[in-house]
Amino acid sequence: MPRPASTVVTSKPARVVLGLLRLAVGFVFLWSFLDKTFGLHYSTGPSRAWINGGTPAQSYLTGATTGKPLASFFESLAVPAMDWLFMMGLLGIGVALVLGIGTRLAAVAGVVMLGFMYAAVAPWVWGSLNPVVNEHLVYALVLILIPLTSAGDTLGLGSWWKGLGLVTKLPFLI
């Protein structure tokens, strides 16, 4: 059984901040799903909404990678199935993090997704804002921190989730 958050991070204020950080990153994923699905006028307008025939992953893979070293690889991934995989990933990661459940699985999925996004935009190419660190890398590091500190236990349902029979038998679901 994993250790409770109170034994991993003993400072209650620090646990609250970790819980808030988990909620914030979870909302980044969840909001991205909602905006791309319904075209809420933030990063996605209604005409490009997924429900209106928009292709969120395909658009990213063919647009953000233009002129980048790995463009041909990422453009080859721009298929309709990738839209479903991307959107379900955003939804699943977002819901898991907001609720504080399945944080291990959400962290692994999120780090993989963000790793692909990091490589797609190739920040090391001349002209980017920072050749090493961008938001994808920062979010990935936060995702790694969340299950390591049992951040789902504070301001979330992590403690309850870890006690479920199926989760105790399949610890990757923690």
List each language-model region with its residue ranges.
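Extended, low-polarity transmembrane helix blocks
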Residues: M1-G92, L99-I174
